[in-house]
């Protein structure tokens, strides 16, 4: 239970599901891994007249909750999955040995069914895949790591994923039996039309940017994703110009950036510089 006195979302959903199914109400639990903030979320949906209606056991009733998920800027799920009552063992795919809940036979992708504006993503790998054909994982940066949110296929270095919600920043990886992810693309932004912008930093072209910090709060740390080292590299701050700004003069051009507090950077998103401003995933 959080300090606010409200239980965790998955526990609330499980409680509501058991209570409502006990009296014959058809209820399911749906889930997403956030792309515009950290961690994950679960909510319920009730079946009526052949259609599922989203609701939250703690917050909002049917239909209002789906509208909230689709319009509030820091929500907007990129993928939505439904927990099934019966396992779907008909799902078959070549297994690479990498373990993820996305492979569960009790999970169904319902992103398109839920009414979100989806697109099919097709992108070429920047690094040679380990084989001519393999599973690949679409990942979002979430609480200090890239977390898989969807499974796709790679064929001759072309990666494909179905029913993705755009206006999000992703990276694509292969999985291994050793439970490691190997990134085969640079991070990229895909907009709502499917246009792709890859973040490949130009270390020979540096830009200057003044970044804000909340008044009275600790200074932030700025990092950029190094596509060769495959981790976020810190960028030195030239000066703290006031109690609300920090000046950086050595930011690689076209870099994916992470601007976060040094301790427990929960909810502080990746982003990029555009038109002289730092845009983060909650801004679009």
Can you describe what each PLM-predicted range is?
Residues 134-152, 222-234:
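Short amphipathic beta-strand segments in non-cytosolic proteins
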Residues 92-119:
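Beta-strand-rich domain onsets/edges
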Residues 176-202, 264-283:
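Structured interaction patches on ligand/partner-binding surfaces of diverse proteins
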Residues 4-5, 10-99:
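Hydrophobic/aromatic-rich core segments of domains that either
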Residues 49, 157-179, 244-265:
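Short Pro-Gly-centered beta-turn/loop motif in secreted/extracellular proteins
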